């Protein structure tokens, strides 16, 4: 869509979007991005982990690839993504951005465009995914990807295993 193209262009003009190391993410105050991102979440019971726990997890994560979005004028980190790679796919495992910059610099548009271009065109992965829809759906990222970047839903079969006695109760109450 043309509106999406304009927002991507604006983001690429205003922002520097690149792969960064886990240490760069910590040093460039990635935790502040995480902390401020939680402000926009619909589920107010959702709170970020502590800074020390987050930094330890990021420092020890040597398997993921990290991307950062920096404002060109100031060099400030305003968004980041943590991606896990497995086989022929890339999972955009966690994307965070500071809400106050979202409607001025459109960091998510540029970030998604650059990551998708890089992984699908340059690195030749078969597909990218944003993972599974959460029960709380606190961020709305799936709807954003479907509407703006023409992602699609890929449904999967869910198999639930119960304790034997609970399974009997479920089958009696819901015979489907």
Give the role of each language-model region:
Residues 1-104, 118-119:
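A conserved beta-strand-loop-helix scaffold within acyl/acetyltransferase catalytic domains
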Residues 35-36, 144, 168-171:
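Short low-complexity, flexible loop/linker segments enriched in glycine and/or proline
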Residues 63-167:
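Aromatic (often tryptophan-rich) hydrophobic motifs at membrane interfaces
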Residues 172-176:
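Acidic/histidine-enriched, glycine/proline-rich intrinsically disordered or flexible terminal extensions
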